[in-house]
Amino acid sequence: MANSTVAEPEKMEQSGTCEEDEEEENMEGDEDECDDDEEENMEPAETVTIGSTYKCRRSDNTLHAAEIIKTRKTKENAEEFYVHYVGLNRRQNEWVDKSRVLQAKQIKTEELNNTEDETNGVSDQSEGKAARSNKRKIEDGDGDQKKRKVDDEEDDFTEDLTCPLCRSLFKEPVILECGHNFCKHCIDKSWESASAFSCPECKEVLTERKYTTNRVLANLVKKAAVGVKDKDVKPKEKCDEHDERLKLFCKDDGTLACVICRDSLKHSNHNFLPIQDAVGVYRDQLIALVSPLETTMKENQKLKCDQSQKISLHRENIVDCKKHIECEFEKLHQFLREKEAKMVEDLNAEREGLLKDMEANLVKMTDNCEFIEEAISTTQSRLNESDPIAFLTDIKSFIEKCCEEHRKGVPAESVLVNKELSQGRFKGPLQYIIWKELKSVVQPGLAPLTLDPNTAHPNLVLSEGLTSVKYTDTKQQLPDNPKRFSQCILVLGAEGFDSGKHYWEVEVGNKTAWDVGMASESSNRKGKIKLNPKNGYWAIWLRNGNAFKALESPSKTLNLTSKPSKIGVYLDYEGGQVSFYNADDMSPIYTFNGSFTEKLYPYLSPFLQDSGKNAEPLKLVHTKL
């Protein structure tokens, strides 16, 4: 009988034995006859309940117990059921119409387990007794067979909880409209390049990209994971499509293949490697990835270390600023305590803003280091994999992911954040900053500076008191001594400083261009000079009436809220600080930080006259407070 032909291999596969026993064959034959009798007495079920188990006619025209999973309506408004066949070695689900659900009576689990005993009961009594006797002998004498059966059941259970795409236990399982389950990540990836959304299992085209989280399945996976987490899940060694051994690796698709896959249209004109050769090729690629990753790791670790050092330095700088603030305000006695508290409050506010970005960047760098360390660990784990099948599974996507992370290198935002504290505000001449409010209290006087005529460019004219300078189109005949500027239109102060703290002011008025700053004693005076700290110049300038710059290397554009008429200059020699202020309201303009090893001189430049628009002189301020 046709049914007997199908049932016998199925029973042999489930029992795990290939023994040809005459009594067993007779028993199986009798069971098939009972199945035929049972089918003759069946009719389509009148009502079908989701979650219940019924006899269902399979696509190969055989009967098998099936659990009803879900239902749907076809375009013709006919009802269909998505069923799961119980007890098969391979998971098999499908949609069936109502006519194929043949038994309305719910089949209990005990009935399923005893199906063979019940069907054998319709055979003659002597054969039934012989079969039961034979069964008891098998149960009593074949413990290994029982163990294999339990293992098979566990494998079936694990198979039901395995994503058909990644072949691993479900992660965030979702269920499609057709009833098939996949990992959320797997189905998203499968649909990325698809023109239409369809189920990878049954190929049913879906109306939209839609799925639902399967929480029940997720809970089952969690429970199953407890039992299998210590077991090694070996990759398949046979092709799912052709049931042939996987002997090749497709370089174009990055997948394992059998010899039939190689000759199929799907892999037409593709390049293949034997598995062992592919292991060698991709192992070399992984090895080549380790070194760049380690280099990137070292770079991130260095940045992390540098950032930590910068944060420590800024913390120390904040402490120094606070001490300076407290010391200066102590000189102003008790009635200035309120102003002191306000300054400390502003410092703390700037501290929070300054350290926030740097500490956030430090966290990013720490995360980068941890991420790269994890990538190295994952790569090393893959390199240590001895099983070629496991090694090559998803190897191409794995390497592409590693390459992508390496190409990123140190992300653009993962650079050293080095924000400067407003030293000009908190560590400057605080008595002058509050001078406008406290003229009756502050009486230190400005540094009495004069200009050195032996350093002045020949087109510069100094006042009789050597306190102002202006440009003239007539070049004066002056001795070309080593101190004199030959090309740059500059003049130095007569008094230099090699210690202490000093403050002075320069009146710039409405001039459209000027330079104000400091110059080292050994700085170059001849020819064209690049004015920056590397060459011994710390200065700011104005050009074209509104373009302010700090002469760093490279120069920095300064955005001032108002155009100053006087520039204040503060030098803290031991502190390595030169700060510039809008002397009208003592708002800080810019601060240079460094270390000084020789005497420093004030320097001025009135610049060119600009057709009379910039003819005003620069003046050193000697007014008492």
Swiss-Prot record:
List, as start-end ranges, the regions of compositional bias called Basic and acidic residues: 126-151
Which UniProt keywords are present, listed alphabetically? Chromosome, Coiled coil, Developmental protein, Metal-binding, Nucleus, RNA-binding, Zinc, Zinc-finger
* UniProt GO MF annotations: RNA binding; zinc ion binding
Recorded hits in SMART domains, A to Z, give: BBC (SM00502), BBOX (SM00336), CHROMO (SM00298), PRY (SM00589), RING (SM00184), SPRY (SM00449)
Where is the protein localized?
A: Nucleus; Chromosome
Ranges annotated as B box-type zinc finger: 234-275
The record's listing under CDD domains reads: Bbox2_xNF7-like, CBD_MOF_like, SPRY_PRY_C-I_1
Known outcome of mutating C202F: No effect on intranuclear localization
Compositional bias ranges of the Acidic residues kind? 18-43
Q: Which residues form a coiled coil?
A: 337-386
In this chain, the RING-type zinc fingers fall at 163-203
B30.2/SPRY domain residues: 429-625
The keyword rRNA-binding is annotated on this UniProt entry: no
Recorded superkingdom: Eukaryota
Naming one, the record's GO cellular component terms include:
chromosome
This protein's major location comes to nucleus
Q: Which residue intervals make up region (Disordered)?
A: 1-53, 112-151
The signal peptide, as residue positions, is none
UniProt: Zn(2+) binding residues: C239, H242, C261, H267
- Residues in domain Tudor-knot? 48-101
Q: Is the Zinc-finger keyword given for this protein?
A: yes
According to the UniProt entry, the note on domains is: B box-type zinc binding domain is required for targeting this protein to lampbrush chromosome loops and for normal functioning of this protein in the oocyte.
Q: What this chain does, per the record?
A: May be a nuclear regulatory protein that is stored in the germinal vesicle for use during early embryogenesis and may play a role in the synthesis or processing of pre-mRNA during oogenesis. Binds 3 Zn(2+) ions.
| Name under which the protein is recorded | Zinc-binding protein A33
Source species: Pleurodeles waltl
Name the lineage: Eukaryota, Metazoa, Chordata, Craniata, Vertebrata
